[in-house]
Amino acid sequence: TFGKNGVVLWRCANGLENSPVCNMGYRPPVKSVGRGVTCVDDLRDNDEVWRVLLSLSHAVSKHLREDGLLAGGVQIGIKNTALFTSQSQSKLIYPTQNSREIALKAFSLFKQTYKWQTPVRAVTVRAIELLNPDKPQQLSLGFDMTRHEKLERLDKAMLRINEKYGKGTVVEATVLNGTKMPTTVPSADKDISFLP
């Protein structure tokens, strides 16, 4: 069955769909921002997965900044060599656009859920529960706002340098060790996601 989309499809097919026509140039609100990649070689340990998650998180962070949104949570998708796909998600303590915070949450989810019975073939990172940065945020006890602001300044500086001098001019040292990602990584204007 198609669930609630089945009703919409049936109504459209039978000429009963009566929602108003959208204005030209209308863009529906963004619900999530994600990047994913099928690696050129299987990922066999946590260090290799961390480097891929960090690279993907930089792309997600860039897209969040372009759209002026904050991530309220992170979702990961993992496909192993048996082509089994699993997804997990978690809320962030404080909404962010920061690539390191997104990557750390994604890696935490990965370590909690993946048991290494088979190597990893593909990885997806998605920012979910998107928020407007102008909306007031509830501070949380135990959240290090000073560290958050420092990481935010670092992320913005890296982004400015990469925009001025070209992608990959400044990267985190961890990524220099190799990511097993294709040399042509999905660009920031293409969303890739796993289908259920």
Kindly label every feature range from the protein language model.
Residues 1-119, 195:
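DNA-contacting surface of Y-family translesion DNA polymerases
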